[in-house]
Amino acid sequence: MARKRRAARVKDKWTLKKWFTLIAPEYFGMAELGETPADDASKVVGRTVETTLAELTNDYSNQNTYKKLIFKVYRVAGDNAYTKFWRFELTREYLNSLTRRRTSKIEDIVDVTTADGYKLRVKSVVFTVRRCKTSQKRAIRAIMRQIVVEKASSLNFVQFLQECVLGKVPAEIYKNAKKIYPIRRVEIRKIELLAEPAEAETQPAVAEAVA
């Protein structure tokens, strides 16, 4: 009997829950990211959902399947749970596939502020064709940091995120860093949201969808 009553209580908990549709930000076309259950809308706020750029844009070409986007619920209206960008990162498997023996891996981590006041932590990585000298690593790292900081300060949050995710920032780093030493690959491997401007905390950003 005790087992039956316990099973009934578990069943009752699930019957009290409802499903909320997770919605991507406007600059990602307000695409549906999935569903999450809760017995109270307030419990949905703060939850995170992970997807890939391929799933989000329905484009499985290039490296889109290796690019992960994590969104965080900030508002619930009716059955919809609206999310904001929380983190971008490349999968560990993809990064491991880029590592080669007798080559150099150069990384940089820098905190930046976009033109519209978003504070982000950006982690970039460069893979060289062969092992390079310490002085060359230092010069390449300086280029990586300079380009990331300058891009962030001249673009708004959505523009900067788009240029990082779609490869424009890595391409610019590649173009400049190869003058120091032959480069095999450049990636923005991670972007973390540290802080938003005050106005963004109460209303979602409005921008064109990322294509």
UniProtKB/Swiss-Prot annotation:
The keyword Cell division does not apply. GO terms for cellular component: ribonucleoprotein complex; ribosome. It holds the Pfam family Ribosomal_S3Ae. It comes from the Archaea. Belongs to the eukaryotic ribosomal protein eS1 family. HAMAP family: Ribosomal_eS1. This is Small ribosomal subunit protein eS1. It comes from Archaeoglobus fulgidus (strain ATCC 49558 / DSM 4304 / JCM 9628 / NBRC 100126 / VC-16).
